[in-house]
Amino acid sequence: MKAAIRPSTLLRLALCTGVLAGLLLSKSSVMANSSTPVDLDFPETTETPEPGQYPALYDVPLALSMHDHFLLTRPLIIEEVTWPTSDFRYGFFDTKTNSLHTGIDMVSEIGEPVLAAGDGEVIFAGYGLIKGTLDMDDPYGIAVMIKHSFGFEGNTLYTVYGHLQKAIVEDGQIVKAGDPIGTVGITGNTSGPHLHFEVRLQDGQDAAVQNPELWLAPPLGHGVLAGRIQNDRGNFLPSKSFSLKSMETGKIWKITTYSQNLTNRHLNDDYFHENFVLHDLPEGTYEISTYYNYGFYKAEIEIAPGAINFVTFRGKQGFVFGYPEISDPAEFLH
């Protein structure tokens, strides 16, 4: 889909969805300053999967702004657009086990194929991911780690696939995106069959985890919402609940921000410094709302397809839309 922008055309955009002549587009008004019309290319959204079919994804790599990084494909074959509930999302802290959830859980049936999310080399397969040696008590159970043949801003990218029934690859094996690497299981610390999926940067250790929802390409016609939920002073509000409602369908998503255990360790994106992400949102108009200090705050936002859309809530100032300015992560902490 193309949109022609002519000189002196005033752009009013609800959210940042692209780059125009090196200028980041945001909610702020932007003036086209070229002497000729400029065409903006947005992802096509005309393909609609039949019921029961795997929803087509945008091709990777996909980045409609200089800060987007959809570099990975789905590690499971899914039949409909689904994503985890607010429980056990990235950044959730489980008080029962005193552990931080450093990935996302994707529910599936035992024995379903698990696929490589990108090209790379298998650097671990089996029990014992944490220690790097055989350990039948490892909480990941049978796991696979891939060191990818591509990275981001000079950092090497890794993915982890946990709780497998079995691994069908071995250390040193080269894989391509979509290659089967194992099957869904219930090994390790898990209460039911699912895939635990992680994205790691730099050295591949869990100290460098990132939210996978910012790295996995969305289905056609869908986008991602990320943001910061903060108090009046600009500090993160950990484990804070809020809602997102589709104005077209009435569907409601309940979302909880990252726990303080995660934000204190700076395990969020180096640019966004987000404390929540919600993936697989159909393009369209939404109402975002939350309670703060006995007040109720809400606003309408537009989700653009194939992009990371961003919103900030700052206490009594309410919601502000558009990509954030570059900032020091320490300023968000208490």
Regions found by a protein language model. Give the residues of each.
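N-terminal Sec-pathway targeting helices
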Residues: 2-16
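Hydrophobic alpha-helical membrane-insertion segments, chiefly the h-region
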Residues: 17-28
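Surface-exposed, glycine-biased beta-strand/turn segments
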Residues: 30-143, 147-151, 177, 186, ...
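Short histidine-centered loop motifs in beta-beta connectors
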Residues: 109-111, 115, 152-178
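Conserved, short, structured surface segments that act as functional micro-motifs
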Residues: 134-148, 173-222
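Hydrophobic core positions of the immunoglobulin-like beta-sandwich fold
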Residues: 161, 278-279
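Short, acidic Ser/Thr/Gly-rich low-complexity loop/linker segments typical of extracellular
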Residues: 248-275
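Beta-strand-dominated extracellular/periplasmic modules and repeats
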Residues: 271-274, 281-282, 293
